[in-house]
């Protein structure tokens, strides 16, 4: 619909049911709606063929529930426009083993979208943002107010449009958006303790290989935006113990025995 400049019409709601303005199948779950569509087509003699097939669907990694992708407003950090800088940062770090740098490089080179840092969860670090109830303009907390939870603390003031009512941001930060700040947090802690020597880049980061694309990558991104060329001089990448060949130990799978 974007290519054709058509307005977005939401069919599936966040609760997994069909929107009220969709004829015939409103209020049904996605699975029930599929069955009802087939029934209606068959009833009107419009169904040419129906057969079972096997195909790939997206599922939740732990419980296996089918996942439906729903477009929504989210917060992003720009990474697509700084790919060259991120590649240079990766080259400036010593990787152990050296082959692991290839994973980082391949991830950066093949990025197709920016970093989504917002999540619809209960627990997490809140965004200090309120939206004008009339025009939707975001209003940010002053640095002196931080930390602040907009769900608990109302915004005082008026929007440029004259409205004085505001809606708090309910999303929270992705866990990588905070864990990627470890060098900055350590530096600030050291400064608070009176340590004046250069603290970043730190000496070494140790981590497992499967989070090169997350923890290592996002820490390098944050370090770039916080005016540090690299977060650490060396990064040591390790593996992890498998429950059986090709399967990692997982609490949800109960295979840790």
Indicate residue ranges for each PLM-predicted region:
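Conserved active-site neighborhood of enzyme catalytic/cofactor-binding cores
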Residues: 9-10, 16, 107-114, 118-257
